[in-house]
Regions:
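A short, Lys/Arg-enriched interface patch at domain edges and termini
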Residues: 50-69
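Short Lys/Arg-enriched helix C-cap and helix-to-coil transition segments
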Residues: 38-45
């Protein structure tokens, strides 16, 4: 028998808390296709934690270093 990797899956409420956004934003982001990847099982929406981590990393902004004379 082969081993399967376990992936943590979150519902919409837990996802909103995980990424610091509202559930309403997640719904809007899904309709506009600008949010994190999601899994649809029947009428349930779920998010994989590795996908959320990647989504957050791609939106990281690193400010430029200010040099003073």
């Amino acid at each position: 028998m082969s081993e399967q990797k376990s992936m943590q899956i979150l519902n919409e409420a837990d996802t909103a808390q995980y990424i610091g956004m509202s559930r309403a934003w997640l719904r809007l982001a899904r309709t506009r296709r600008i949010g994190p990847p999601y899994i649809r099982i029947a009428s349930s929406i779920r998010y994989a934690v590795p996908d959320l981590d990647k989504f957050l990393e791609t939106h990281r902004v690193t400010p430029k270093q200010i040099t003073r004379n």
